[in-house]
UniProtKB/Swiss-Prot annotation:
One GO term describing the cellular component: cytoskeleton
Coiled coil, from the record: 31-139, 174-204
Organism: Monosiga brevicollis
Membrane-crossing residue ranges in chain numbering: none
PANTHER family: COILED-COIL DOMAIN-CONTAINING PROTEIN 42 LIKE-2-LIKE (PTHR21683:SF2), COILED-COIL DOMAIN-CONTAINING PROTEIN 42 LIKE-2-LIKE-RELATED (PTHR21683)
UniProt family annotation: Belongs to the CFAP73 family.
Domain of life: Eukaryota
Keywords annotated in UniProt: Coiled coil
Name used for this protein in its record: Coiled-coil domain-containing protein 42 homolog
Amino acid sequence: MAGLREFFKETVEEKLLQQMPDDVLQQTTPATQLLEKRRELEQVERALATQKEDFHVRMATLDQRKAELERKEYQLQESLLKFDRFLKENDARRERAEQKAASENEVAQAREEQVQNLRAELRSLQERKTRNRDILQRYSIFEAFMQTVLGEYPEYNEVQDVITRYKTLVATQQDLRSRDRNNQTEIERVRREMARYKEAHRVSMLDCSNKLATLRTAKERAHTETLYWENQLSAVQGAASKRTLLLGQIKMYAYPPAHPGTCPTRTWLALTREPRCCHEPPR
């Protein structure tokens, strides 16, 4: 009997008495709620049919047990009569008969208790059946509404088609949410990778800037040194030019041309020729 109660509790009572959470009711549409109620009604009907069949089987078993109990009671009466005769005939038989009667009384008492338990369970099942009938009557309005919905949407021939469509949409929504989570994870990974690349680029640019500053400093130092040596070279060249000019002037004054009209080439040769002694006559 405990197994029957557990089966009923698992298949009917919990499915009928449980209430959907408020947040789920707010998120679902009336049509979805009707589909859910329709599914629960079908499950209740199947469970009630199973319970009804099981109840008939158990009632038949109970009737058999009751008949057996009546037969045993009749046998007990016969045994009591025999017990009286056995008491007069033999004390030993009387003792055995008493033991047998006591044993049968225990069995009868146990069976009577079992009958009482079965009757109590039967009353409980009848009460639950009444409650289930009331629940079915309350849910009948949802069935009527579902039929109205089917009339307004001819693309759905049966309620099961609507339920199948709903399940498909739910599965699609779950798949899209899973893809969105995967995409968010990939985006976060790319962002972290980009941040690492930016940091590496910043460090590289900073290093290049430091190297560029060092090279610019070296360039400025080299440019300063170049200007210094160019100035030195210009000074040396200027001094050399002045000395060459002075030497030319000295030669011109020291060796004037012999007479006007002298060939310039000879005059230049005369100026560039090594000076002779003043006592050496010109050639």
